[in-house]
Swiss-Prot record:
Cofactor(s) required, per the database record: Mg(2+)
Lineage: superkingdom: Archaea
Name of the protein in its database record: UPF0292 protein PYRAB04740
Pfam families, sorted: Toprim
Length: 132
């Protein structure tokens, strides 16, 4: 990860920690990674339920963040989920996933790798230099 992306990455992690809705991930390792980062939001895993059922459960929250993996399969899942959730009238956050993909796709394959990336870049860019 480049130094100029570090601040953006840090802001994404802060946003995840402060998020007050439900976060949809693909599997249990994704949830573990987010919990290690200090995320307290409700986390709904796709691995055990059909998409329509996940969307129905998530639709009970004011806002839903979709954090599927950063690969093609994750992209397809995110689009389908967003369509279902918008049909329920949910406010859907796909921008966080898009931002992560833009700055970290070369560094991680999926959400399960997020915590390890956070540790690596935190060590690399600590202490913060002026202008970073």
């Amino acid at each position: 990860m480049y130094a100029e992306n570090y601040k953006i990455f840090e802001a994404i992690i802060d946003k995840l920690r402060e998020f007050d809705g439900a976060i949809i991930v693909e599997g249990p390792r994704d949830e573990i990674s987010l919990r290690k980062l200090g995320v307290r939001a409700e986390i709904i895993k796709l691995s055990r339920l059909p998409l329509a059922e996940v969307a129905l459960i998530a639709s009970q929250y004011k806002e839903v963040m979709i954090l599927t993996d950063l690969d093609r399969k994750g992209e397809e899942l995110a689009k389908k989920l967003a369509m279902y959730l918008e049909g329920y009238g949910c406010k859907v956050d796909t921008e966080t996933r898009r931002s992560l993909k833009m700055i970290a796709k070369k560094d991680i394959k999926g959400i399960e790798d997020l915590y390890n990336l956070y540790l690596r870049v935190s060590l690399r860019f600590w202490p913060p230099e002026e202008g970073i």
